[in-house]
């Protein structure tokens, strides 16, 4: 009976010294409209970069991401998908970023921040909607899918009201 109250799909992970339990919503969003175009749900453990292949395809032409997305494997996948990389450059011990690289990362951050606005909206304006109490990845995937759809409806209404999109 205890097993039916326990989520065997969810996992614990630590990020910046804070422990998190549950699942992650990985999204692909349009950089101009901030609408979610694709999403993927995983337990909290896998690194964000592992889902990139499920979110990027030939219809995408640019990837904006932090330095966690910089790897040879991801760069190869982006070439195959004909997607241009705007991923932040990493500094290493003994090989820090140059001023040009820092400036380049700063420009990339302005666009990448638009994705963070989506999660901020879900947390602040949608009553902390990312905090879900469901058991099982199937239910969580359905809930997150509906959450992403609801966000898109809010955003679409805003785009129409601000006359950014014409019907």
Residue ranges and their predicted role:
Residues 60, 82, 141-144:
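Active-site lining segments that contact anionic ligands and/or coordinate catalytic metals
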Residues 81-89:
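Short hydrophobic/aromatic-enriched beta-strand-loop microsegments
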Residues 50, 73, 94-101:
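Short, charged, surface-exposed secondary-structure boundary motifs
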Residues 103-167:
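Basic, amphipathic alpha-helical segments enriched in Lys/Arg and hydrophobic/aromatic residues
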Residues 41, 89-93:
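Short, acidic/turn-prone active-site loops that include or flank metal/cofactor-
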Residues 1-79:
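Polybasic low-complexity intrinsically disordered regions
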Residues 62-64, 86-87, 162:
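Acidic/polar loop patches that form or flank catalytic/metal-binding clefts of enzymes
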Residues 67, 89-90, 117:
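Short secondary-structure boundary segments
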């Amino acid at each position: 009976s205890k097993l039916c109250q326990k989520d065997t799909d969810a996992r614990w992970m630590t990020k910046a010294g804070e422990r998190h339990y549950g699942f992650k919503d990985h999204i692909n969003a349009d950089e101009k409209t901030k609408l979610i175009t694709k999403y993927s749900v995983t337990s909290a453990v896998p690194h964000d970069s592992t889902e990139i292949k499920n979110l990027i395809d030939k219809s995408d032409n640019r990837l904006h991401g932090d330095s966690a997305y910089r790897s040879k494997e991801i760069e190869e996948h982006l070439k195959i998908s004909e997607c241009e990389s705007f991923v932040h450059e990493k500094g290493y011990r003994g090989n820090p970023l140059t001023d040009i690289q820092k400036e380049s990362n700063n420009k990339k951050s302005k666009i990448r921040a638009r994705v963070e606005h989506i999660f901020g909206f879900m947390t602040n304006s949608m009553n902390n909607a990312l905090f879900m109490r469901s058991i099982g990845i199937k239910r969580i995937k359905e809930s997150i899918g509906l959450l992403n759809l609801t966000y898109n409806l809010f955003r679409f209404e805003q785009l129409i009201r601000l006359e950014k999109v014409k019907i």
